[in-house]
Regions:
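Substrate-binding cleft of secreted/luminal carbohydrate-active enzymes
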Residues: 83-170
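Polysaccharide-binding and catalytic clefts of secreted carbohydrate-active enzymes
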Residues: 1-92, 98-103
Length: 170
């Protein structure tokens, strides 16, 4: 890992295998959990919450994307060729995406904007799962002391129009 970060600076083959193994463990759990929930009651919806910062979320051992999304082909240096196989979006009936950007970063196309987080999640889900995106209104820069009611309509618009729904984490 790069000094002072949690990111792999120049990933080796063994590091990529470890990252893929960790994602496989979570994938296999999600696959079994979804099957168990649906075996008890097929009408119960099964889902998950994840942080939308996919570019660094691999450090949590999670690949929340569709297995149709190929992060190695998309240029993520930490992803092995088989990492895509451990995406688990197709095992969920819905997902919540934490679009936890600063209060001043509502609109945009890239990660670290609320709209960008939701747009990028849609690309990574490949239509496998409906999802709601939303902000953390208690922790990121600009939200710590409240007083942001005036920007909530923009936040709702940015997230809900790039996702299938909206939620708020407080």
């Amino acid at each position: 890992f790069a000094p002072g970060t949690e990111d792999v600076s120049t990933p080796t083959t063994l590091q990529k295998q470890w990252i893929a193994f960790r994602a496989k463990v979570i994938h296999d759990f999600m696959e079994k959990a979804a099957a168990k929930v649906h075996s008890v009651n097929p009408d119960i919806r099964f889902g998950a919450y994840v942080g939308a910062w996919y570019s660094t979320y691999y450090t949590s051992g999670v690949n929340w994307a569709s297995p149709k999304y190929d992060p190695a082909a998309a240029g993520y240096s930490w992803a092995s060729k088989d990492y895509k196989e451990y995406g688990y979006a197709d095992h969920c009936d819905f997902m919540f995406i934490g679009a936890y950007a600063a209060a001043t970063s509502i609109w945009g196309k890239n990660e670290w904007t609320m709209q960008g987080f939701c747009s990028k999640a849609r690309e990574k889900f490949k239509g496998d799962v409906p999802f709601a995106g939303g902000p953390d209104v208690g922790n990121p820069t600009g939200f710590q002391n409240g007083g942001q009611a005036a920007i909530m309509p923009d936040i709702v618009d940015a997230c809900i129009n790039a996702a299938d729904g909206f939620f708020v984490f407080d």
